[in-house]
């Protein structure tokens, strides 16, 4: 599946193809849009369309070359209303200097200059043409080129460059955005050569459930607390307060061998006490 329309320097490595397959970027939907037919490899017996990952890699390189052609990185706007792509576009923007719109796209952001969120990008990249339809529609009004991650059933109206991939899986979306960011940095010279691996793991671009993140944070705090209490207790309680275990114990304040201050004659001591056999004194008044 190696792309034949690219210079040899842009050819995908076996690791890149394996990563695309492992992320299930080649698994499309059962529906097929007519403009996505050239990117189809085959249709399985269960009706699922399989995407040609060689075509996917070609479009990743093409999209990266278009993004690199923009002089100011901030003039590129990456958009994702789909939750699985929000973390990916934020990381892409952080690594490449682009603007990110993660979540709901405010209508009028490209056409209404009165709004606070008004932007004038020279290029937009969207995660899903269906969920990001408002952004694509406004971009068509102001002549902004559009790059989109398109599944086999995605509408391609007003899309200039379609990257054929699975745009519904969390791993597939993160993998494509990670590869696109890496290719942009390679073309800009941030990554010196193609043999040098990028030190950013692809896992950073994957969607994570907020509840799972909160649980992981609680577990980390518990483990950190256990690790801090153990050495701290040993150092402060035993090491500093314990002293020398073999040292002789200090003498008591008063000698235990001295005779206690007790009466010598118990009979004389009891003489002043009233006899238990005597009758009780009469009460002063009657109830």
From Swiss-Prot:
Residues 235-287 are annotated as: Disordered. The keyword Acyltransferase does not apply. It is found in: Cytoplasm. One of its GO terms (molecular function) is structural constituent of ribosome. SUPFAM superfamilies: Ribosomal protein S2 (SSF52313). One of its GO terms (biological process) is translation. Required for the assembly and/or stability of the 40S ribosomal subunit. Required for the processing of the 20S rRNA-precursor to mature 18S rRNA in a late step of the maturation of 40S ribosomal subunits. Belongs to the universal ribosomal protein uS2 family. Component of the small ribosomal subunit. Mature ribosomes consist of a small (40S) and a large (60S) subunit. The 40S subunit contains about 33 different proteins and 1 molecule of RNA (18S). The 60S subunit contains about 49 different proteins and 3 molecules of RNA (25S, 5.8S and 5S). Interacts with RPS21. This is Small ribosomal subunit protein uS2. It comes from Pyricularia oryzae (strain 70-15 / ATCC MYA-4617 / FGSC 8958). The lineage of its organism: Eukaryota, Fungi, Dikarya, Ascomycota, Pezizomycotina.
């Amino acid at each position: 599946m190696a792309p034949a329309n690219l210079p040899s320097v842009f050819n995908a490595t076996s690791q890149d193809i394996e990563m695309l397959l492992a992320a299930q970027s080649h698994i499309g939907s059962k529906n097929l849009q007519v403009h996505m037919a050239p990117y189809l490899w085959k249709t399985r017996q269960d009706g699922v369309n399989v995407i040609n990952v060689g075509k996917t890699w070609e479009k990743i390189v093409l999209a990266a070359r278009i993004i690199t052609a923009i002089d100011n990185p901030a003039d590129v706007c990456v958009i994702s209303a789909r939750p699985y792509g929000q973390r990916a576009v934020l990381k892409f923007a952080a690594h490449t200097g682009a603007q990110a719109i993660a979540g709901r796209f405010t209508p009028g952001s490209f056409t209404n200059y009165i709004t606070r969120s008004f932007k004038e990008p020279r290029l937009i990249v969207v995660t899903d043409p269906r969920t990001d339809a408002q952004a694509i529609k406004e971009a068509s009004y102001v002549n902004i080129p559009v790059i989109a991650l398109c599944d086999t059933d995605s509408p391609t109206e007003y899309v200039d460059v379609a990257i054929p991939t699975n745009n519904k899986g969390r791993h597939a979306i993160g993998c494509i955005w990670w590869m696109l960011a890496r290719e942009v940095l390679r073309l800009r010279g941030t990554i010196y050569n193609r043999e040098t691996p990028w030190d950013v793991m692809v896992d950073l671009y994957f969607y994570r459930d907020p509840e799972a993140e909160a649980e992981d944070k609680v577990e980390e705090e518990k483990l950190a607390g256990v690790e801090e209490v153990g050495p701290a207790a040993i150092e402060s309680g035993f090491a500093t307060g314990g002293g020398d275990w073999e040292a002789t114990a200090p003498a008591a304040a008063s000698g235990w061998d001295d005779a206690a201050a007790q009466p010598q004659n118990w009979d004389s001591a009891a003489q002043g006490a009233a006899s238990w056999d005597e009758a009780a004194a009469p009460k002063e008044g009657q109830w």
